[in-house]
Design a protein with these regions (language model features):
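Phosphate-binding site recognition
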Residues: 1-355, 461
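A cross-kingdom feature that marks ATP-driven nucleic-acid transaction machinery
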Residues: 320, 326-489
Length: 489
């Protein structure tokens, strides 16, 4: 059993993840066989979490071989089996030759675990499990046999599997219709850091950085711990970002392509969709995506959109005011920044520093800040004192006509208490001063929105901005103000 001292030590070494650590501890201390799946976006810190929470508790652990550098598909199964065999040798396997099939490999693992079984809890950890399942390898049937035929009959076994290919994890484990149906005893999804957790991370690393720049780092790196780990103390946000993404030897060289190849079997189709979604903040319909990318509208496109959504790169939502039709919107900040700026400017080692005050970067900040707000709805609701009110978020786009100007609202909070928060998001380096022209635009949006509401509903014009509002003659209609400090709660 993990002691209280051990748990406190683990929690102090990991930013956030309190619930996840407690859940892994509960599973470790149970008196029955446990089969837990841990999944989440690549680079989000799944492996680090597991290895810290269960430090020194592993009986056997193995990591699948990344497909990124395996060009020869015919040898992928052989490579995976060879790597698995070496892991077993490192853990004490003796008297067996390299297996030629996964059924043979798991039989050898069973023999090894029986040899190592002391009656205490045995933790068996497979990292990047989806990588092990190569085409025509019959891996899954052998893995099913390993759990159903061996692990499940031993009360001291805790099987932990981890994977970045979220769709594979969900389809083959969580929603399995085969031999693993209903076999998971728990599943844990690991999410990116919130802004508050990013701040805690930088403090832990003794990196001095303002909240304004933490928000900017979130706009680029999306709260992914692995990316933040490349920040260096003593450098500005601009300099750090240039070193991580730009120049001849950036720390995340070719990360976009490697990211997609590591997760998706149809990575080229996935990247086509991402590049399209970058071009319009509120997203595209399925039909528009098919038309623009040339991908057929059949089941293949539906499957690709589904795996992108399950992997948290895109989200599907119903635009406000539309009874039919769903939109797909990009929600991965890193992909947005990479496609917009890194791909075209990677050789410029000082791109961020050179363009920091340019109109190009200002336009990006506007879109990226809206993304950050979507990702921190909980914090915004808390600031608006509606944490207990059921609410959904949406966007609204109304094309203009010859008679009437259109409008676009990127963030609506539609509440069950008959109030709709129309959120204006402004990322500024100082307090926001509403001009006469901007007030007119805001009021136009409010009036158009009111036309769609019932008589019992009210619109609250809400400003989400960096450093608050300059109260003047054009700001009176704003009901609530949310600052970036509020996003850190």
């Amino acid at each position: 059993m993990l002691s209280l001292r051990q748990i406190i030590t683990i929690m102090s070494a990991i930013i956030g993840r309190k619930h996840e650590i407690e859940e892994l501890e509960r599973l470790y201390n149970s008196d029955r066989p446990e089969f837990v799946a841990v999944y989440g976006r690549r680079r989000v810190g799944k492996t680090y979490l597991i290895k810290q929470a269960l430090k020194d508790k592993f009986t056997f652990q193995h990591t699948g071989v990344s497909p990124v550098d395996q060009e020869d598909e015919k040898n992928r199964m052989k490579t995976q089996l060879e790597s698995f065999y070496y892991s077993m040798l490192n853990h004490g396997l003796e008297g067996f030759k390299q297996p030629k099939s996964w059924m043979e490999a798991f039989y050898q693992l069973e023999q090894l675990l029986q040899k190592l079984d002391s009656g205490q809890r045995m933790v068996v950890f497979f990292d990047e499990l989806p990588w092990m399942d190569t085409p025509r390898s019959r891996f899954l049937s052998a893995f099913e046999s390993f759990w159903n035929g061996w692990c499940n009959g031993r009360d001291n076994v805790m099987l932990v599997v981890c994977g970045s290919a979220t769709s594979w994890m969900l389809s083959n484990l969580s929603r399995s219709k085969g031999g693993l149906y209903g076999r998971l005893t728990d599943e844990i999804k690991v999410y990116p850091f919130t802004l508050k957790e990013c701040e805690e991370y930088f403090e832990h690393e003794c990196i001095e950085i303002s909240r304004y720049d933490i928000v900017q780092s979130y706009m680029v790196f999306g709260g992914i711990p692995y990316y933040l780990s490349y920040f260096r103390k003593g450098y500005s946000f601009e300099r750090n970002t240039d070193m991580i993404l730009f120049g001849s030897k950036p720390r995340l060289k070719d990360e976009f392509n490697r990211l997609f190849k590591a997760i998706f079997t149809n990575s080229d189709d996935c990247k086509k969709i991402i590049r399209l979604l970058v071009t319009r903040n509120y997203g595209f319909t399925r039909e528009e995506i098919a038309s623009a990318t040339g991908l057929p509208q059949g089941g293949g496109l539906s499957d690709t959109l589904a795996v992108l959504a399950e992997s948290d790169f895109i989200m599907r939502y119903s635009p406000y005011g539309k009874k039919a039709g769903e939109y797909y919107k990009l929600v991965d900040n890193f992909c947005l920044f990479w496609v917009r700026y890194v791909e075209k400017n990677q050789d410029n080692a000082t791109f961020i520093n050179d363009n920091f005050t340019s109109d190009v970067m200002r336009a990006w900040r506007g879109v990226a800040f809206e993304q950050v707000c979507w990702q921190h709805l909980t914090q915004i609701k808390r600031t608006l004192e509606i944490g207990g009110v059921r609410a959904s978020i949406s966007a609204w786009n109304v094309p203009g006509t010859e008679q009437k100007a259109g409008t676009q609202i990127d963030f609506l909070i539609i509440r069950d208490d008959n109030i709709v928060n129309l959120c204006e998001m402004k990322f500024y380096s100082s307090s926001y001063n509403v001009s006469k022209e901007e007030e007119a635009k805001m009021l136009h949006r409010v009036e158009m929105l009111k036309e769609t509401l019932s008589s019992k509903q009210t619109v609250h014009l809400t400003l989400v901005t960096s450093f608050g509002l300059v109260h003047g003659k054009h700001s009176g209609k704003i009901q609530k103000v949310v600052t970036i400090d509020d996003l850190f709660i």
